[in-house]
């Protein structure tokens, strides 16, 4: 039933986009850089697989991890050199060197890695643990953690956007990041004696500070910081960093 509900909502979204939105494209629409896509896909695939294998720790095949990382590095090197030569690169090398690219992508990657691990892994698992946790059932835990987190972000997102228009993206982003750190510190103390109310508080707190503020600002900056001649590269790479 959950999957059918998701399918119905997706179908409604498809119809809504078709009916209520207008198509938009960049001023220039060059051909797809397939020569750059291939080495980039190989590089990212190998690096992600290497990290997944390394996550097994004692049971990990470290030889495989090293090989995958080497292949990934070779893929990135090939991608870099391809982008310097093709007429319409997927990502111009000049943009790859700029601070607006790496500052945004590294912030997105690092914050998402931490918050995702806490909110999608540690908090729900702690809530369900009957020995060290709150002993909440699997059918209830999402209502205490993930749902409030998502709803808090949904409600506060428009507020964060309004704040950014008045105070600036940088200030609001920094506020969200500081708040996220505070929320994670609070989580450390919650671990000692978790219950439904403390987990709910942490979930809502992080929902506001990260999902509602920091996440929204990072998405917005992906658009604001994009150069006029290549408006799609930074939002696309930022989406990859989120994933």
Stretches found by the model and what they are:
Residues 63, 88-243:
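12-transmembrane solute porter fold
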Residues 2-107, 114:
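Hydrophobic transmembrane-helix bundles of small-molecule transporters
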């Amino acid at each position: 039933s959950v999957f059918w509900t998701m399918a119905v909502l997706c179908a409604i979204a498809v119809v809504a986009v078709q009916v209520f939105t207008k198509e938009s494209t960049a001023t220039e629409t060059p051909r797809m850089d397939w020569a750059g896509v291939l080495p980039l896909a190989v590089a990212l695939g190998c690096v992600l697989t290497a990290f997944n294998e390394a996550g097994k720790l004692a049971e990990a095949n470290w030889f495989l991890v090293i090989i995958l990382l080497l292949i990934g590095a070779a893929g990135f090197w090939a991608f870099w050199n391809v982008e310097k030569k093709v007429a319409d690169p997927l990502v111009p090398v000049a943009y790859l060197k700029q601070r607006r690219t790496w500052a945004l992508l590294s912030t997105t990657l690092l914050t998402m890695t931490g918050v995702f691990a806490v909110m999608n892994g540690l908090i729900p698992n702690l809530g369900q643990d009957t020995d060290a946790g709150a002993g909440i059932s699997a059918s209830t835990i999402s209502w205490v953690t993930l749902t409030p987190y998502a709803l808090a972000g949904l409600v506060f997102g428009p507020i964060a956007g309004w704040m950014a228009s008045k105070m600036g993206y940088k200030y609001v982003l920094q506020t969200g990041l500081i708040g996220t750190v505070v929320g994670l510190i609070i989580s450390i103390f919650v671990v000692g004696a978790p219950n439904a109310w403390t987990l709910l508080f942490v979930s809502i707190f992080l929902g506001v500070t990260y999902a509602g503020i920091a996440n929204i600002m990072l998405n917005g900056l992906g658009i604001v910081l994009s150069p006029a001649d290549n408006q799609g590269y930074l939002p696309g790479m930022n989406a990859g960093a989120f994933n």
